[in-house]
Amino acid sequence: MAISLLDTAFEAELRALVFLFFLDEPVNADYLGAIDTLTINQRSFGIGSDNLNGTHRLAAGELRTRTDLMRQALKQLALKGLTIFDTSAEQVGFRITDEGASVVNKLRTEYAERFFAAALDTFEAAGRASTRQLAKIITSVEAAS
């Protein structure tokens, strides 16, 4: 996936905030990269009826780039005080702060609404799947393409 204007670290920051808003446990960039890949490309992965950024054959190939974008995004979000790195739970990772949740609550565009719905659908479909299980889903679709 070539990084385009729509796939900047800033856009990844907004998507990461939305994901963290819905999660009640700390997560890392690998998990968010997998969830991001599935959410943006729902139709390609059989989760929903739409691919938010359009349909293409190489959706499964986005995992590494989306994970890298999430890694950059989480660093910036932590520096801005919108996330914290939580080591108090059994699973360490990033959580959203109250300030980060406030930013999410201000996202009111049509795309944001579509993204919220897609993220919820993805979390419902993923259930309690681990990062490894999500990556396996993504790569199995790539192999089948």
Kindly give the residue locations of the regions a language model identified.
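Short, hydrophobic, well-ordered secondary-structure elements
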Residues: 28-40
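Short capping segments at the starts of secondary-structure elements
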Residues: 23-30, 44
